[in-house]
């Protein structure tokens, strides 16, 4: 997955809202969202059929997990307009998501992620959140856990440490190539989401869907900007030739009133495919949270 937008505890009545675009090689096989059996309960997640596991999911305790692949550190020999290519021989990052979905809370998931084996995976960022807490794991050879405050968080394929939402008061990443298209995308998307969340008269899902469809440089039906430096990967909806691009998009809203929770998804790029209402899957998952759910999870894990 390449663009992950999370609004955590900043929308009244909706403690967790997610928008996510998955960019991947078009030939890589996958299944769409479905309810599946995890090791400690049920989960709602798509499935990667090439390596197993998944790139995002929600469990029946209300823990959301989403992973984005990280590019190598900016170097002269790294193509800023190319896809993220994994080193062979390392363990699948999809199994990290599946393991995190076994947790009873975001805090529990983050504690387990902090114990990940050193050097076992290609680089990634993984965000876990429930209705109370959110954590970001940045993994480059070893895990680093960041506590996220309430607000808007946008995660992509670069470790954007200038994100004041994620690292308040820290001025990191100044040596990063600010012209990198993925860095520009994170800044643009963050600004757009902040504006949309303040528009009380607009449906939040419709606004997020519009962002997920966007192309930069005047290409496509939802085009923004006209920079000559725009590239495929500055767009939220990516079309990088015949082999790589946005494969699917997902919108998730967990409301305090569970009957008002929503799930929309596309099978294909959202600029070409309409969002389908997948909310019945979310209702069938029957998300539970709070002390009762934690007690049930503890009972399950002791069996």
Name each model feature, range by range.
Residues 1-303:
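N-terminal nucleophile
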């Amino acid at each position: 997955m390449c663009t992950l937008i999370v609004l955590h505890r900043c929308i009244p009545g909706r403690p967790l809202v997610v928008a996510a675009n998955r960019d991947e090689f078009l030939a890589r096989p996958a299944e769409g969202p479905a309810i599946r059996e995890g090791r400690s309960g049920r989960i709602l997640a798509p499935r990667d059929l090439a390596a197993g596991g998944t790139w995002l999911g929600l469990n029946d305790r209300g823990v959301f997990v989403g992973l984005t692949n990280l590019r190598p550190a900016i170097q002269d020999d790294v193509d800023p307009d190319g896809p993220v290519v994994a080193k062979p021989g390392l363990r699948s990052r999809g199994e990290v998501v599946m393991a995190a979905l076994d947790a009873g809370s975001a805090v529990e998931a983050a504690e387990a992620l902090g114990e990940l084996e050193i050097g076992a995976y290609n680089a990634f960022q993984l965000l876990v959140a429930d209705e109370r807490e959110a954590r970001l794991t940045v993994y480059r050879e070893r895990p680093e856990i960041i506590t996220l405050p309430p607000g808007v968080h946008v995660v992509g394929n670069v470790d954007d440490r200038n994100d004041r939402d994620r690292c308040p008061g820290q001025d990191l990443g100044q040596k990063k190539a600010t012209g990198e298209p993925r860095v520009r995308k994170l800044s643009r998307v963050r600004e757009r989401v902040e504006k949309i969340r303040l528009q009380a008269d607009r449906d939040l899902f419709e606004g997020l869907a519009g962002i997920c469809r966007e192309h930069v440089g005047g290409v496509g039906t939802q085009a923004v900007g006209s920079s000559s430096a725009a590239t495929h990967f500055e767009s939220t909806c990516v079309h990088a030739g015949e082999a790589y691009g946005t494969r699917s998009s997902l919108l998730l809203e967990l409301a305090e009133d569970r009957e008002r929770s929503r799930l929309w998804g596309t099978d294909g790029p959202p600029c070409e495919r309409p969002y389908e209402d997948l909310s019945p899957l979310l209702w069938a998952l029957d998300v539970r949270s709070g002390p009762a759910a934690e007690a049930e999870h503890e009972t399950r894990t002791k069996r």
